[in-house]
């Protein structure tokens, strides 16, 4: 028997002084576009461990106060995304091998037209809305269609 199971992508929404840390992708897909630090979960780790590992690998960033924030089911590509909201420990970050650069962004400065993936755009919009409201519910939803890309 052979099973083909979905892939789990884990990542963080690292925040420092009201700004969110983004990474400019150095690899395909969507090379040169901005994303949250995230990647495929590895065998033998929890989703939390995977999210913090990916944040270190892609942005050389240490995080604390890590809480589950967003889950997306993306059945048309057999993926599940899990993002954790967290604090960027000391504000320090730098590009890892899968990132061209890293940068902290206030909401008004985010390069919205250059965000790599729909799940990242939606997560960022929800984060800033939730931050303004002072309440961070865990959200679960599905994206069951391909977004149009320019």
Label every PLM stretch briefly.
Residues 7, 25, 115:
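Surface loops and adjacent helix of pleckstrin homology
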Residues 15-57:
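Conserved Nudix-box catalytic region and its N-terminal flanking loop in Nudix hydrolases
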Residues 1-12:
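Acidic, metal-coordinating catalytic segment for phosphate/diphosphate chemistry
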Residues 11, 19, 101:
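Conserved beta-strand and immediately adjacent loop positions that scaffold enzyme active sites
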Residues 41-126, 130, 135-136, 149:
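Unchanged
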Residues 12-14, 72:
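Short acidic-hydrophobic surface loop/beta-edge motif
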Residues 140-150:
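Amphipathic alpha-helical surface "interface" segments used
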Residues 8-10, 30-32, 64, 80-82:
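A generic structural signal for short beta-strands and their flanking turns/coil linkers
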